[in-house]
């Protein structure tokens, strides 16, 4: 239940900071889901980069929608957070996609997709979103260490 309370807490924060709740923001009405950890997919619009909901890792079905007209301002705001686990870029233009991938400061980026993992592809964040990579050979190396041993013979 604490996970559900965390979602409710972030919805309150989003509303208090001036975000506009477009949909969701509550537990489902379905009686079969009332006792679980379910929370409706939630979308906030009219968000600003300084809002807490936009600056923290929520790890829940809560989406903040922003509007920009200047690409430099967009990436400045996107990268001006303490976290950088994942990012999703939605575009019809591959040139735009590649430019965005170079500019976004996250450890994992999807283009026209979200939340899909690929076997063997390193997964992990930058900044306060952790260190190291999971789901790849590098993950195994995280559990080892190198040791240099020198032996003088004679």
Where would I find each of the regions flagged by the language model?
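Short, small-residue-biased leader/transition segments that mark boundaries at the very start
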Residues: 1-5
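Conserved C-terminal structural/oligomerization subdomain of aldehyde/semialdehyde dehydrogenase
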Residues: 34-154
């Amino acid at each position: 239940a604490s996970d559900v309370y965390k979602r409710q807490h972030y919805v309150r924060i989003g509303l208090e900071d001036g975000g506009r709740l477009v949909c969701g923001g509550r537990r489902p009405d379905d009686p079969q889901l009332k006792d679980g950890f379910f929370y409706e997919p939630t979308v906030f619009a009219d968000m600003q980069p300084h809002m807490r909901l936009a600056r923290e890792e929520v790890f829940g079905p809560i989406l903040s929608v922003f509007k920009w007209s200047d690409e430099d301002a967009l990436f400045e705001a996107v990268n001006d957070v303490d976290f950088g686990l994942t990012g999703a870029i939605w575009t019809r233009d591959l040139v735009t996609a590649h430019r965005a991938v170079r500019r976004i400061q996250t450890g994992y980026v999807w283009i026209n997709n979200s939340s899909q993992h690929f076997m063997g592809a390193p997964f992990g964040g930058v900044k306060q979103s952790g260190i190291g990579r999971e789901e790849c050979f590098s993950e195994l190396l995280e559990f080892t260490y190198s040791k240099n041993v020198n032996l003088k013979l004679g």
